[in-house]
UniProtKB/Swiss-Prot annotation:
Transmembrane stretches, start-end: 30-50, 77-97, 122-142, 160-180, 193-213, 215-235, 252-272, 298-318
Encoding gene per record: TRAM1
Lumenal compartment segments: 51-76, 143-159, 214, 273-297
Protein name in the entry: Translocating chain-associated membrane protein 1
Residues covered by region (Disordered): 334-374
Subunit-level organization: Interacts with SEC61B. May interact with Derlin-1/DERL1.
Amino acid sequence: MAIRKKSTKSPPVLSHEFVLQNHADIVSCVAMVFLLGLMFEITAKASIIFVTLQYNVTLPATEEQATESASLYYYGIKDLATVFFYMLVAIIIHAVIQEYMLDKINRRMHFSKTKHSKFNESGQLSAFYLFACVWGTFILISENYISDPTILWRAYPHNLMTFQMKFFYISQLAYWLHAFPELYFQKTKREDIPRQLVYIGLYLFHIAGAYLLNLNHLGLVLLVLHYFVEFLFHISRLFYFSNEKYQKGFSLWAVLFVLGRLLTLILSVLTVGFGLARAENQKLDFSTGNFNVLAVRIAVLASICITQAFMVWKFINFQLRRWREHSAFQAPAVKKKPTVTKGRSSKKGTENGVNGTLTSNVADSPRNKKEKSS
């Protein structure tokens, strides 16, 4: 996000700058229209599609279960309207966090433009990852996923979801869809847009795939696992911006990143490659939401494996580049040993050295600051 300069003159109404400065208020007014529509009988039927979850089914109580009937949900085309409304909510929450939390910290810390953008990105994502991780863990515990891992593939297709499960997926889709207009609202640099589009697109592809293919149980577990690792990275980057000597969080993140990729592959192969492959019903049936056929299973495993390989390749490539730059920087310091300035040069080499762990950005490290200034 670019640093906004305060001006005494207010921009013209509906101008480019006006929309950027007041986009949260504009979106709030649009969301308020849907909420006000619930108050009138004529518009209530249309507004309720946007605000509440659709496609609920009430199942009668059984002797083994509780005496009360259960209300479950499945997905449909009307979910797009619900996702749109909560996308507006995500934009509003994004603006609130930015204005009342991150901007205040930025004024105190006096970050550079590069750090300002990275700090805002990590601040927003760490808040989202923490919330989604806690929420997802609550669903896993309440629905006994931890005590019985076979629930990941047993009784497939999982076309009926609880309220918490469906609302979780609707919220995930809404959040990552809101990231597209945020690229405009936050004045993202053109060179950063392709990276952001790939980043957002991968999230939407996998979340929507798990939702539409009725693999919501597996998708929930993998999302919680991935969000926890990503939360650790972004919270470590926030601490790094406040104190550049902080590196322990990145070292722990590097270990958990590799473990997270391995667990993702193990759970995916165990669920799709073994659990669903041994299921009795392996016929494609759109009416019941059964996609347990060989072609779909191969496509699911291929997409997961390719994505994990891409993430590991980016991780290894970044680490190798950092270690190569660290070695190249230390080599001249070892060769040059002037007698007069020996103590001074060795001190500079220690200050500018990098320990090889992953930091927030190569441009943000103290060593690169030294190179830029020179």
